[in-house]
C-alpha cells in the first residue's frame, strides 16, 4: 500500500528542487522531516508541507503506521514556464523565464 501527495505549479525551478529531493529519497518519514527542517533552502519548506500531507494521507486514508513509513519516490517535474521580458538599452528586451515545478512524494510502509 502506498500513499502519495502532489503539489503542482510551485514557483521554484525543478533543478533547485531536485537538490532537496535527493536528500530525502529512500529515508524514513521522520528522518526526512528532520533533514528538511535543517536544510536552508526554499524547496525544503515546500517539501515539509508535502511530506506532512503525505503522512496524513497515509494515516487517515490507508490506516498506516507513521513510524514505518519510508519515502519511496520523490518526483520533481517541470511545470509551465512564465515568460517575462526585461527592458534593456536601445530598445532591446531580454527574456526571463520564471520556471515552475510539479512536486510529488510517494510513501510506502516498510
From Swiss-Prot:
Keywords: Ribonucleoprotein, Ribosomal protein, RNA-binding, rRNA-binding. PROSITE patterns: RIBOSOMAL_L22. GO terms for cellular component: cytosolic large ribosomal subunit. SUPFAM superfamilies: Ribosomal protein L22 (SSF54843). GO terms for biological process: translation. One of its GO terms (molecular function) is structural constituent of ribosome. Belongs to the universal ribosomal protein uL22 family. This protein binds specifically to 23S rRNA; its binding is stimulated by other ribosomal proteins, e.g. L4, L17, and L20. It is important during the early stages of 50S assembly. It makes multiple contacts with different domains of the 23S rRNA in the assembled 50S subunit and ribosome. Part of the 50S ribosomal subunit. This is Large ribosomal subunit protein uL22.
Amino acid at each position: 500500500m502506498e500513499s502519495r501527495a502532489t503539489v503542482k505549479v510551485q514557483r521554484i525551478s525543478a533543478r533547485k528542487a531536485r537538490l532537496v529531493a535527493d536528500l530525502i529519497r529512500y529515508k524514513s518519514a521522520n528522518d526526512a522531516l528532520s533533514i528538511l527542517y535543517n536544510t536552508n533552502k526554499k524547496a525544503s519548506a515546500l517539501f515539509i508541507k508535502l511530506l506532512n500531507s503525505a503522512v496524513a494521507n497515509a494515516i487517515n486514508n490507508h490506516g498506516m503506521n507513521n513510524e514505518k513509513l519510508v519515502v519511496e519516490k520523490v518526483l520533481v517535474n517541470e511545470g509551465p514556464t512564465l515568460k517575462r521580458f526585461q527592458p534593456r538599452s536601445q530598445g532591446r528586451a531580454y527574456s526571463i523565464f520564471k520556471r515552475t515545478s510539479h512536486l510529488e512524494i510517494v510513501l510506502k510502509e516498510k
